[in-house]
Each structure stands twice: as structure tokens, then as C-alpha cells.
Swiss-Prot record:
Name of the protein in its database record: DNA mismatch repair protein MutL
A cellular-component GO term for this protein: mismatch repair complex
Gene Ontology terms: biological process: mismatch repair
UniProt cross-references to PANTHER family, sorted A to Z: DNA MISMATCH REPAIR PROTEIN MLH, PMS, MUTL, DNA MISMATCH REPAIR PROTEIN MLH1
Compositionally biased intervals (Basic and acidic residues): 336-346
Pfam families (alphabetical): DNA_mis_repair, HATPase_c_3, MutL_C
Family to which this protein belongs: Belongs to the DNA mismatch repair MutL/HexB family.
Length: 603
């Protein structure tokens, strides 16, 4: 006998919705803090006990809720943020579905105190979604929500929660992202009475970065911005020398909402291409403004994922913005000082200040270093404006004048070699200090730029082979190469069918290394076969990297002084001389000041 279809009760419906909206304590914090942001709050306090399993309290100074709307707020799909279907496609708030409050209330004990500041306030208490009490409350403008005994009526959910430190880490990550998205709001977060995050809400994104990631990271960040007809981007990108082993430090914010978008992350990584080692990822915060009509935020239960109608154009704008911003700078990292030296530097008290708006007389670089010790973090949570200095960095502007670009064309100074260590590292000097150059990485960068340009030219100047090369392949690889013949021709490999599962090659580009033609051809074909589908851009890029790596001098290769001079002079002509194509540093500098400090010539 068929089962009858019945309509679920509101209580059961809310519990089902809670399964998507309220996965863990961090979900509760996210939804309630976003409500506080939507209410126009300028200060939000987040008080958490036992990683949110015991109690979560959110206090804001927002607009509050009218007395007659308080109970309605806990009905499913009751909201003040959208009124009709058209509003759904122009969402200006973080929340809009009306699911959060009833979902949270259905799996917890919840007390809400709220007031618009014009009349007496209202207090309402719920247990498992049922209203227990509603009465008059305080008249302070704003809202305070206390959530306790989370998941008391869904014990199965408790089994799948992680350890308290992990759950606390999830909460902290959510609040960090919200603080980065809203630097104009003061966030004050504490756990078991211990302050963990505090921002001052003055609108300065770099100070928020300092509060979250530390002042040393903020000092290594440069402002970036770009604009098109559809998008306006601003934010801070941290120099490539400071990187992480995962993508967790990439923050993309669209219209005030932190989102996860693989295409935008790829675009950011493309902007850092050849500046970061393989497996390393940047620290970057981008705030993107666009018309809500071209972004759909109603595609994910937690609203973390969005759909963009012009995703490709936005990605290209981001990549070019990052590339151009770093192309204006000298990216020679400072040499590491010893742990003891760092401890001595930390013991010194220094006075530092922001100099964001001061324009330098000369094009700013990261090469120069102020004659001051390292910053010492204080016990305070919020870094104040006079707590640290940030060197003035150029902001990317697509309309940069050609004259300015030309002035910055020489990206590293003249260096004079003085010797070689372990037949691997070149030592050089000038008036600025000591330089250590990885000879393989240096030539790899030079050859990469040469091959990348040659491969991109698609020249038809060919050298005939005295003995044509016949290559045989398994049938599956033969079929794939048939499909990729046009792409291979774009990088100088001309395959002709020659019997079953075979190709013949009769010529190659004139710029192929002499006596290594067959090896290069096979390497390029292997690159094409290494991925099921490869774009011509990716094939050219991978081919240039492969050729530059294999054809550069290696470690344990002795060089004459003339060889070293020639290598360094050629390196100065490279467009990006600071890293090899794999992102490893080419050159490290010890300034004269740092050396004198190490030898106690200056104190």
C-alpha cells in the first residue's frame, strides 16, 4: 500500500533547514554576525564559550527589531531584506532567505533582546524553536542574541563535530573573513573571556590585515586596484616572498560577502605565476564591487559560492592587476638573520608610523630598507596607527603613464661578482650590500623569457633535419596527438602521419638548441600528452618552463669571473629577474646595514 504524502510540521521543517544552515557553531556565528552587519552595526561583540558549544553571544548596535516583528522573525522565510522576486536578483544584504533565526532556534536555547532605541525593547526566549516567553526588555538600541545548548535535541549532530580547538578555529576563520570584508565595522571577539580579535572599524583594510595576520605581513603588503565597466577591485597583495602552503589566505570578497570561487583563485594564482614556488600560495585580500544583477548569491546553503555572469573578464582583470603591480617593484628578498639576532632586535623599542599618503620623490621600491630594527608586537590586540610603518607602495592603475613605466624598467642594480660558493651560488656586491645569486635559477629565468617569446612568435623559419625523426606511439596516445596537432604546430612541432600509429618530423624551428633537437621534440610531445586537455597558452607556458630548466647550467658547475659577469648582466635585462619560472628566488640581498649590525658595527 502506498504511503500517504503529508505536509511536514514547521518544527520539523526548521530542523531539516538547520541541517544545511547550521552545521556547526561557526555556522551560528556567521549567520548572526551577518544579521548584525545587515542591521547597520558599527560595533559587533562576539562572546563564545567552549568553542560555541556552551554559549554564543552576539551584541550589536544596529537598527534593532520592532516589538511586533520579534516573534515573526522566527517564522521560516520571514525577512525584511527582500519583498519580491525582483529583489532576489539584486541582493544588497548578506542574508535574505529568512532561514537563519528559525533554524538556529530549532536546535538550541535562544534568547534575543532587541530595541530600535525609540521605545522600550523586547526580550524573547525560545527552546527548540518554541517560544517560551516574550516580555519587555532594555531600551538600548541594537540586538543581543544568546545561543546556548546548541544541538541539544539533535545529538547525532554533536557526534560529527570536531575537537574544541578545531571548532574554535572555524569560528575564528569566519570572523577573520567578515572583518576583512568590513573594515568599517569594529569586531571584538573573545573566547572564554580571552580576547582573540579586535579591529577598530576605521575603514583601513591594512590595519585589519595587521590585526589578523600580524604587522609583519601587513608591512609586506602592497595596495592593488583595478577598474572596468563592470568591476571595481581594491585590496592588498602580500609580496611573493611571504607565502603559505594552502589557499586559506586567499580572500575574495564580492559586494561585502566573502565567497569561494575556484576561477577567481586560479586568476589570482595566475597573477603570481613564476613568482611563487610550486605548492605555495599567496596571501591576498581583494574587495570586488559589481552590480548585483551580474552575481547570483542564491546557489549555496551558506551563500559561500556564487555564480558570476562575467567570470572570465573578472579573472583576467585580477590577473593583470597583480602582474602589473609586482612588475613595478624590486622583489629581492632580504637575507634571513639568525634567531639570536631576531631576539636581540625584538628587545629594542621603536616608534613607527603609517606613511600611506606620503608620495616618495623617487619611484618606490622594496629594495631599500629603513635603518630601523624589526617591529616588536605589543600585548595589545589592535595595532594602532603609530605602532608600525609601511613603506609606500605603488597602487596598480591601468592608466599608468608610459614615462613612469620606463623609469622603472631596470629592476635590479648593477652587481659585481666576487666569487662562487660550492659551484652553485654567485656572490656579488655593490654599494647597497651583498648579493647571493642561484646560478641555475638565474639562467633558468633568462632562458624561460627567451623561449617564451620564441614559442609565442609561431615563426615558420624551419631547419630541415638531415635524418627525419619517426616516432611511434600506443594507439591511445596517437589519437590524442592527432587531436593536438594544431596546438603542437603552435610551439614548433610539425607532425606528419607516417604509417600506423606513427608520425614523422622533417623540420624544427631554427631556435631549437643545436644537437638537442630530437630530445626537445620528444619533451614537448610528452608535455602535450601529460594532460587530457591542454590549451595552447598552457602548452606554450609548460614548454618554455621545461626547456629553460633542462637547458640551464646546474649546481656544481664552476664559472669563470667572465661567465658570472655575463650572467648577471643578462639577468638585469630580464623582465622579471627575481624568481625562476617555478617561483624559487633567484637573488637574495644582505644590505650593508644588516651586515654591519650582525658584526656589531652599529647598534
Amino acid at each position: 500500500m502506498a504511503k500517504h504524502i503529508v505536509e511536514l510540521t514547521d518544527a520539523l521543517s526548521n530542523k531539516i533547514a538547520a541541517g544545511e544552515v547550521v552545521e556547526r557553531p561557526a555556522s551560528v556565528v556567521k549567520e548572526l554576525v551577518e544579521n548584525a552587519i545587515d542591521a547597520g552595526s558599527t560595533v559587533i561583540d562576539i562572546l563564545v564559550e567552549e568553542a560555541g558549544l556552551n554559549k554564543i553571544t552576539i551584541i550589536d548596535n544596529g537598527s534593532g527589531i520592532e516589538e511586533e516583528d520579534v516573534a515573526i522573525a522566527f517564522l521560516r522565510h520571514a525577512t525584511s531584506k527582500i519583498k519580491n522576486e525582483a529583489d532576489l536578483f539584486r541582493v544588497h544584504t548578506l542574508g535574505f532567505r529568512g532561514e537563519a533565526l528559525p533554524s538556529i532556534a530549532s536546535v538550541s536555547h535562544l534568547t534575543l533582546e532587541t530595541s530600535t532605541g525609540e521605545t522600550k525593547g523586547t526580550t524573547i526566549s525560545l527552546e527548540g524553536g518554541k517560544i517560551i516567553e516574550q516580555k519587555s526588555g532594555h531600551a538600548r538600541k541594537g540586538t543581543q542574541i544568546e545561543v546556548s545548548q546548541l544541538f541539544f535535541n539533535t545529538p547525532a549532530r554533536l557526534k560529527y563535530l570536531k575537537s574544541l580547538p578545531t571548532e574554535l578555529g572555524n569560528i575564528t576563520d569566519i570572523l577573520n573573513r567578515l572583518a576583512l570584508a568590513h573594515p568599517d565595522i569594529s569586531f571584538r571577539f573573545s573566547h572564554n573571556g580571552k580576547p582573540l580579535l579586535q579591529t577598530n572599524g576605521n575603514g583601513d583594510l591594512r590595519q585589519v590585515i595587521a590585526a589578523i595576520y600580524g604587522v609583519s605581513i601587513a608591512r609586506k603588503s602592497i595596495p592593488v586596484k583595478a577598474e572596468s565597466l563592470d568591476f571595481k577591485i581594491s585590496g592588498y597583495a602580500v609580496l611573493p616572498e611571504v607565502n603559505r602552503s594552502n589557499r586559506n589566505y586567499i580572500s575574495t570578497i564580492i559586494n561585502g560577502r566573502f565567497i569561494k570561487n575556484f576561477a577567481l583563485v586560479k586568476a589570482i594564482q595566475e597573477g603570481y605565476h613564476t613568482l611563487l614556488p610550486i605548492g605555495r600560495f599567496p596571501i591576498i585580500v581583494l574587495q570586488i564591487e559589481m552590480d548585483p544583477i551580474i552575481v547570483d548569491v542564491n546557489v549555496h546553503p551558506a551563500k559561500l559560492e556564487v555564480r558570476l555572469s562575467k567570470e572570465k573578464e573578472l579573472g583576467q582583470l585580477i590577473s593583470q592587476m597583480i602582474k602589473d603591480a609586482f612588475h613595478q617593484l624590486q622583489l629581492i628578498p632580504d637575507g634571513e638573520v639568525s634567531k639570536k639576532q631576531k631576539e636581540q632586535q625584538k628587545s629594542e623599542q621603536i616608534q613607527m608610523s603609517f606613511e600611506e599618503n606620503r608620495q616618495p620623490k623617487e619611484p618606490p621600491t622594496l629594495f631599500s630598507k629603513p635603518n630601523i630594527p624589526e617591529y616588536v608586537p605589543s600585548d595589545e590586540i589592535v595595532p594602532k596607527e603609530d605602532d608600525f610603518i609601511l613603506e609606500t607602495m605603488p597602487t596598480y592603475n591601468p592608466e599608468t603613464q608610459p614615462e613612469q613605466v620606463e623609469e622603472q624598467k631596470e629592476r635590479i642594480p648593477k652587481m659585481y661578482p666576487i666569487g662562487q660558493m660550492h659551484a652553485t651560488y654567485i656572490f656579488a656586491q655593490n654599494e647597497n650590500g651583498l648579493y647571493i645569486i642561484d646560478q641555475h635559477a638565474a639562467q633558468e629565468r633568462i632562458k624561460y623569457e627567451f623561449y617564451r617569446e620564441k614559442i609565442g612568435e609561431v615563426s615558420r623559419e624551419l631547419q630541415e633535419l638531415l635524418v627525419p625523426i619517426v616516432l611511434e606511439f600506443p594507439s591511445d596516445e596517437y589519437v590524442r596527438l592527432e587531436e593536438q596537432k594544431a596546438k603542437l604546430e603552435e610551439v614548433g612541432v610539425f607532425l606528419e602521419n607516417f604509417g600506423q600509429n606513427s608520425f614523422i618530423i622533417r623540420a624544427h624551428p631554427t631556435w631549437f638548441p643545436k644537437d638537442q633537437e630530437e630530445e626537445m621534440l620528444r619533451e614537448i610531445i610528452d608535455e602535450a600528452l601529460s594532460a587530457p586537455s591542454i590549451s595552447i597558452h598552457k602548452l606554450r607556458e609548460d614548454t618554455a618552463i621545461m626547456m629553460s630548466c633542462k637547458k640551464s647550467i646546474k649546481a656544481n658547475h664552476y664559472l669563470t669571473m667572465q661567465d658570472m659577469e655575463a650572467l648577471l648582466d643578462t639577468l638585469r635585462e630580464a623582465s622579471d629577474p627575481f624568481t625562476c619560472p617555478h617561483g624559487r628566488p633567484v637573488i637574495i640581498q644582505y644590505s650593508t646595514y644588516e651586515l654591519e649590525k650582525m658584526f656589531k658595527r652599529v647598534m
